[in-house]
Swiss-Prot record:
Its main location: cytoplasm. Signal peptide: none annotated. It is an enzyme of class 1 (oxidoreductase). It comes from Corynebacterium sp. (strain ATCC 31090). Monomer. This is 2,5-diketo-D-gluconic acid reductase A.
Length: 278
């Protein structure tokens, strides 16, 4: 199974479906990533704060897959925004990953109370210029954060990785991203178990119509919206199921029905609010 890629605003390509290792224990990470690579994943998403970059690196090294065939993302943690900390942080991440360069480096959270995310973004631009990452982006950034970093630097992030699922679609952010050619990456795309997305009528109807599981129907909804998506599992059968989403298309009516699952009041949020994370 070959995962389609989409083109970022800097000209680089990114596989539209990847494997995220959030909450994968460090001791289990190498085997989990090895299995994901065996199944066919080529896009791996980690972060410094996850504590499992070394396992990702070990899996990459053991895989025998050419580096050019992989897309590796990691992230700058909140306490590394000041001074030259971003440069030190990416050096540490690269050492743990046993790589010379990542494909995408993200500012993990804006932490607006510290008021240093503009500086962090300026440093990210320098890291890209130095060849330590091919693309740069952000995660969990709201529209005011995005507008501020773009106004300060003139550089638009390639991606914004945000919590996004049918019950919480963050349309203000996705509309802004579409207007500025920023690709959205969905984390928690299946609702993280807080919502019975798989029992919702629009999802079950779409799944039944195409002979797919509810999870596959939700993932297909993300993909047809143009989002990059990271379903997470450590079970091989689920890894395979999550990858088997490129042989069907939801109808416009099915997409509209899933769109309507968001009540629009923000109640679908599972994670912390970006303005409150420090």
């Amino acid at each position: 199974m070959t995962v389609p890629s989409i083109v970022l605003n800097d000209g680089n390509s990114i596989p539209q479906l990847g494997y995220g290792v959030f909450k994968v224990p460090p001791a289990d990470t190498q085997r989990a990533v090895e299995e994901a690579l065996e199944v066919g994943y080529r896009h791996i998403d980690t972060a410094a704060i996850y504590g499992n970059e070394e396992g990702v690196g070990a899996a990459i090294a053991a895989s025998g897959i050419a580096r050019d065939d992989l897309f590796i993302t990691t992230k700058l943690w909140n306490d590394r925004h000041d001074g030259d900390e971003p440069a030190a942080a990416i050096a540490e991440s690269l050492a743990k990953l046993a790589l010379d360069q990542v494909d995408l480096y993200l500012v993990h959270w804006p932490t607006p109370a510290a008021d240093n995310y503009v500086h962090a973004w300026e440093k990210m631009i320098e890291l890209r210029a130095a060849g330590l990452t091919r693309s740069i982006g952000v995660s969990n950034h709201l529209v005011p954060h995005l507008e501020r970093i773009v106004a300060a630097t003139g550089v638009v992030p390639a991606v914004n990785q945000i919590e996004l699922h049918p019950a919480y679609q963050q349309r203000e952010i996705t509309d802004w991203a579409a207007a500025h050619d920023v690709k959205i990456e969905s984390w928690g795309p299946l609702g993280q178990g807080k919502y019975d997305l798989f029992g919702a009528e629009p999802v079950t109807a779409a799944a039944a119509a195409h002979g797919k599981t509810p999870a596959q129907a939700v993932l297909r909804w993300h993909l047809q919206k143009g989002f990059v998506v990271f379903p997470k599992s450590v079970r091989r059968e689920r890894l395979e199921e999550n990858l088997d989403v490129f042989d069907f298309d939801l109808t416009d009516t099915e997409i509209a029905a899933i769109d309507a699952m968001d009540p629009g009041d923000g109640s679908g949020r599972v994670s912390a609010h970006p303005d409150e994370v420090d």
